[in-house]
Amino acid sequence: GGYFSPYVNPNLDDGPKGEYLTDRIGNEVVNFINKHQNEKFFAYVPFYSVHTPIQSKKEYQEKYLNKVGDENHNRADYAGMIESLDENIGRILNKIEELNLSENTLFIFTSDNGGIRAISNQFPLKAGKGSYYEGGIKVPLIFSWKGKIEKESKSYERVSNIDFFPTIKKIIGNRDKKLQLDGVDLNPIFKGKSIRGRSLFFHFPVYLEAYNVHLDNGTDPLFRTRPGSVIIKDNWKLHHYFEDGKIELYNIEEDISESIDLSIINPKKTKELFDDLNEWRETNNAPIPLKENPDYNQRFVDSVNFLIINKKYARSITN
């Protein structure tokens, strides 16, 4: 399906012909808030935008056609989609304000992953969606709560979407201690306090194919990421890949692009993070593949890598 009705989506009723999906979702949420304004409510609003297919309303795309972007962001259709998203988020916030619900409503804006390199370059972050590098896992995050969170305040704490549930649980006064929580309560951050000393873990023991073997800037030409794990502790980030045991260490405070691997020159920090990662995997029974794939074809991989290298070489001569 696409962003214009009829949507060809079995989970979505069609609207009037030509209806724009982002507007449709905005309307649904505004109507929901109107209906439940005198009750406690929770609205999870996963806008399809911005996601492929990249389809903007014609008038919004035309608005950006003659505007100059930069080296990494220069697509009128993408910009038009973002404006529609921004407009509908504004409608939701305005409705909350109009109904005098702002002081009793926590608003969270975020994303599930980094952008796709082929559509929107994440520079200076490395790689993009599907990668362990910052371009794949670092996303925007905004909390808004009138009277509870200082306007335009900023925090540089590293947090995760798994923290939302414990945070909301605390706010609504749920005292159920039997729940096993992976995240932490972020309410102290709302008051300007710190939750430092907490590490973040990412574990993905499978393969994820590359979008573009030349430009994805992942661990290798064939995959955006290979089976592995990552730990972020303070300003340090360690990657561990299962196939060959490869380890990469970065200081992401000084090197957000993850361009300088410090694992060899800083063995003490490498061991510290690797030990922490192993302890976390053992505690959580994180699966690690140990059996080799009997259908693995090394000759095919070598031939693909050979073609890739030769195409890169040909382009460098042309340029």
Residues covered by each model-derived region:
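Long, internal low-complexity/basic segments
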Residues: F164, F201, Y207, E243-K246, ...
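Formylglycine-dependent
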Residues: G1-F41, F47-S49, P53-S56, Y211-P221
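A long, amphipathic alpha-helix that forms part
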Residues: Y20, R24-N34, E62-N104
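Active-site rim elements
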Residues: L12-E19, N74-A79, K148-R158, I171-K178, ...
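Loop/turn elements at helix/coil->beta-strand transitions in domains of secreted/extracellular proteins
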Residues: Q37-A43, L101-F107, I195-R198, D234-W236
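C-terminal cap/loop subdomain of S1 sulfatases and analogous C-terminal strand-loop tails that border
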Residues: G115-S120, P124-Y132, I149-E150, E157, ...
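Active-site His/acidic residue clusters
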Residues: V29-D77, I116, Q122-F123
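Histidine-centered active-site microenvironments of extracellular/periplasmic hydrolases
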Residues: P53-E59, N94-K148, S160, I309, ...
